[in-house]
Amino acid sequence: MLNRFAAVLVVCGAWFFAALPAVAQPQAIQYFPVGPIYEYRWKLLELALAHAPAKTADEPTRLVPYADDVTQNRGMHLLQTGGIDVIALGTNAEREAKMLPIKIDILRGIVGFRVFVIRAFDQARIAGMDEQALRKELTFGLNSQWADLPIMRANGFTVETSSSYENLFGMLVAKRFDAFPRGLNEAGRELGERRLAYPQLAVERTKALYFPYPVYFWVNKDNTALAQRIERGLTAALADGSFRKLFETYHATEIALLAKEKRQVIRLKNPILPAGTVAPDTHWWWR
């Protein structure tokens, strides 16, 4: 009898809790791109969201990397269709037409300062080149989906492409091209992660390119609430100095190295910048 009574209680209890309205859990904010070289971008977004707390209980606060390995173009498509919430990429007119940028440069122009990953035995050859020789004698490697590809070509450089970022390192070793331009904040870190796979590669010591290239957070055009929240948070982090502190923490090595180096900096035009784009403020790390 007791067993039957207990069973009735279990059934009734299950029915009672099933009948209760489900409590909606805040959805996560999915971001792209993902990987070690992008860590700073997402720490900055985390900082911005902390400076602009959610106004409602169901507003997303938790950041989650997009799980699938997709190309940059695919990532932008997913943002436009609701599969991804935030991306962090450089700007151009096409992107600004399709997505909603938060127009605060999150990398302060440092991505536009490009040094070259090269085969180590080419150090002396490239060091002896002037600007004209760089254009005439070198072939550069870039991802076919990166926004800096048309910048390089518009400035007279010969470029070999691949849709795979990782394949570009192997192509450089195989002499498919001569130099892989990488952001000042990217080159050393990327080679450090691949020193066992590609010990024959090095960062070139004497040359650099610079073009204005702001990097923004982007959201779906309809997601104005998230855009406003990110902008509010970034503005607050700029005001209290925490934005700059985070930037300098992540880029301290590169900033110190640049201060000591005597590189020939070749300034390039950026024809893909939308009209009215504010030039990056580089004084945190350069001049």
Predicted regions and their residues:
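Acidic, polar ligand-binding/catalytic clefts
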Residues: 67-135
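Short amphipathic alpha-helical coupling segments at ligand-binding clamshell hinges
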Residues: 40-44, 222-233, 242, 246
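Short helices/loops that flank or line small-molecule/ion binding pockets
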Residues: 65-85, 154, 166-186
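Ligand-binding clefts/hinges and TM-proximal coupling segments of bilobed small-molecule sensing domains
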Residues: 143-154, 234-287
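Periplasmic-binding protein-like
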Residues: 109-115, 119-122, 192, 196-231, ...
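Bilobed "Venus flytrap"/periplasmic-binding protein-like clamshell domains
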Residues: 34-54, 116-156, 168, 185
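Extracytoplasmic small-molecule ligand-binding "clamshell" domains
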Residues: 24-98, 230
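Bacterial N-terminal signal peptides
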Residues: 6-19
